[in-house]
Amino acid sequence: MSIIKREVTSPELTRKSAKIAAMLSKPVKGKFGSKLSILVLRYAIGKLYRSIPKADGVKFSKVMLAGTKAILAETMAGSTSLDIIVYIHGGAFISGSAAATKGYASALARRSGCRTYSIEYTLSPEVLFPVAFDECLNAIDALAGDNPDSNITLIGDSAGGNFSLALAMKRKDKISCVILHSPVIDFSDTIDRLKYAPDSPVAKNGLKNFFAKLYIGGHDAADPRISPFWGDYEDLPPVFITCDKDEVLYADALYVYEKCEEYGIKAEMVVMDGAFHAFATVGEATPETAKLLDDYIAFMKDVNISHKIKQ
């Protein structure tokens, strides 16, 4: 178990960091959480995801997994591994898509040799919890049932990291590894984000009230399916975590690592200085993220050889 600290050094990632910072500095059109602001956010997030180039030699196909839409990415030559990656995109539960994240999914498929399924869960606020969570859960159950000899790795960023951790807790018997990029794990406003991000409006205002209307609905924010902060970390599959040093969700990422350490779960964490939230999903587009991609793919493969799922 270890926490590895790295710095942004390449012009490629430096430029992307500056671009993200400039975008975040712009005022939001409409009251945040309004229909207009959500549409603007969806456009902006989709544009960012689509800016990541698709990996060569990877094909895509639309599939259905127990009624849940997904996009399968696999190499033209066919997968070289029986194992499966399930990628769940981020976007604050209200934006992003499997279609927009083909660049990152294709990098996962090419580097790992695994079939990579990107889940096209239904966004909020069109639906509220637990619709999207259950869609992801049903997809995992379908893949596990149809592929009994395959290890399944969950990869998620931000809101997708929330889903991935909560799903791994729910299906410890079916998940062999979890890779989390800047996960958000607490909507009960219990975790101390101000400790690491004292100037962040998100840390100051909390997430509970905002997401109560947009995602949580009338459910308890301390439900582990909503806030895996409150979940059961015992016997969790091995976890690899990435985040930026100065982002507001650093506290969330660190908490997951420390809980893994407490329960003796195999875990690694990479903290980047000078990047941005969920920077790892840039994939092969920068030297730092390409190296990181190789690191967590190697972690996954090592885990899949040594980690035995309890039957």
Task: Report each predicted region and the residues it spans.
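A glycine/proline-hinged amphipathic helix-loop "lid/cap" segment
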Residues: 1-78, 305-311
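Alpha/beta-hydrolase superfamily serine-hydrolase fold, recognizing
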Residues: 28, 65-71, 76-311
